[in-house]
Swiss-Prot record:
It holds the Pfam family DCD. Homotrimer. The lineage of its organism: Archaea, Methanobacteriati, Methanobacteriota, Thermococci, Thermococcales. It comes from Thermococcus sibiricus (strain DSM 12597 / MM 739). The keyword Hydrolase applies. This is dCTP deaminase. Pathway: Pyrimidine metabolism; dUMP biosynthesis; dUMP from dCTP (dUTP route): step 1/2.
């Protein structure tokens, strides 16, 4: 079951919470303070925006911290405005028990720059209730993230 707006407001910790971001069946996450575009760190809060060049790759931190109970998972989708501009997003499930800001990956498939502004709504997250609480909620290496996180995968 996907949680409706009133249950999201009551059951999911999102901070800072923005009433304009609350949707009938989800919440619009906003561009946070940090990003990395083609390997270069950007202080989005200071710059006011980030620019993803054509065929460019970006990691973007969400403004919001999201904390999920052990019986709820998150599923994220790029807002259609950005898909229409050629932006593609690759997002993992947000596991039950997750707590932190999210680092999300994007690719600009277009021939034009895509500009995202600090605090702009860019990804919607929907919350799905599990049949029962997870016996093994997320407690992994990215738990508690407050800053942009690069891959912690070990390459041999």
């Amino acid at each position: 079951m996907i949680l409706p707006d009133h249950k999201i407001r009551k059951e999911i910790l999102i901070e800072p919470f923005n009433e304009k971001s609350l949707q009938p069946a989800g919440y619009d996450l906003r561009v946070g303070k940090e990003a990395m575009v083609n390997g270069k760190f950007i202080n989005v809060e200071e710059e006011g925006k980030l620019v993803i060049p054509p065929k460019g790759h970006a990691l973007i931190l969400t403004l919001e911290r999201v904390k999920l109970p052990d019986d709820v998972m998150g599923d994220m989708r790029l807002r259609s405005t950005f898909a229409r501009e050629g932006l593609l997003g690759s997002f993992a499930w947000v596991d039950p028990g997750w707590d932190g800001n999210l680092t999300l990956a994007f690719f600009n498939s277009s021939e034009e720059e895509v500009i995202l502004h600090y605090e702009e709504r860019f990804v919607q997250i929907a919350f799905h209730r599990l049949e029962e609480p997870s016996k093994n909620p997320y407690r992994g290496i990215y738990q508690g993230s407050q800053h942009l996180k690069l891959s912690k995968r070990k390459i041999r």
